[in-house]
Curated annotation (Swiss-Prot):
The keyword Transcription regulation applies. It catalyses: Hydrolysis of Ala-|-Gly bond in repressor LexA. It is an enzyme of class 3 (hydrolase). Pfam families: LexA_DNA_bind, Peptidase_S24. It comes from the Bacteria. One of its GO terms (biological process) is DNA replication. It comes from Chromohalobacter salexigens (strain ATCC BAA-138 / DSM 3043 / CIP 106854 / NCIMB 13768 / 1H11). This is LexA repressor. HAMAP family: LexA. The record marks A91, G92 as: Cleavage. The lineage of its organism: Bacteria, Pseudomonadati, Pseudomonadota, Gammaproteobacteria, Oceanospirillales.
Length: 212
């Protein structure tokens, strides 16, 4: 794709691609501002809007990580080695997400529907009745467009968990698929909840070097 980006816009774009490659999700405005030395997130917002107008990203309103790559850039952000395995996700009580790629699985994104963007390692048994077990790799499609009852990867207070999503008004319940675990109730007026993606498949026992 032909792009006429300014030097600063190119730096912002490169940081977005780097972050998505390393973490599996886009940066926030504050993270862009901090990394590139902007005085405030508003400066990052201006550059993001310029990139959106030039067609190299698409901004999704209503979420702090609402940045999507378009066309060739999206393909370039996907490793040719397969799907990246990103950190760990608590399937019990939430744990801090590991912000690094452990390895890659030799599996095409289009193996899953919708296509997977990365794999997250599951720890714990809170989702066992949905067939998601300790040590599995959960295939995740990056999106904030979800419906009640779907299994999501949610980030709550900088921690990540896999749960079934239910919402009523300002309240969200992150519901386990194990009677031993109580639902996590979130008041969106007072707590910061971000949906990192939708669970689209499971690789059983993904702790080894290959797929099982």
């Amino acid at each position: 794709m032909s792009r006429s980006l300014t030097s600063r816009q190119q730096h912002v774009f490169d940081f977005i691609v780097k972050t998505m490659n390393e973490l599996g999700y886009p940066p926030t405005r504050a993270e862009i501002a901090r990394a590139l030395g902007f005085r405030s997130p508003n400066a990052a917002e201006e550059h993001l809007r310029a990139l959106d107008r030039k067609g190299v990203i698409r901004m999704i309103p209503g979420t702090s990580r609402g940045i999507r790559l378009t066309g060739e850039e999206d393909a370039a952000a996907t490793s040719t080695d397969g799907l990246p395995v990103v950190g760990e996700v608590a399937a019990g009580s939430p744990i801090l997400a590991a912000a690094h790629i452990d390895r890659h699985c030799p599996l095409a994104p289009d193996y899953f529907t919708p296509r997977a963007d990365y794999l997250l390692r599951v720890r714990g048994l809170s989702m066992k009745d949905a067939g998601i077990l300790d040590g599995d790799l959960l295939a995740v499609h990056r999106t904030q467009q979800i419906r009640d009852g779907q299994i999501v990867v949610a980030r709550l207070d900088d921690e990540v968990t896999v749960k079934r999503f239910k919402r009523q008004g300002h309240h969200v319940w992150l519901v386990a698929e194990n009677a031993d675990f109580a639902p996590i109730e979130v008041d969106l007026r007072h707590q910061d909840l971000e949906i990192e993606g939708l669970g689209v498949g499971v690789i059983r026992g993904g702790g080894g070097n290959g797929l099982h």
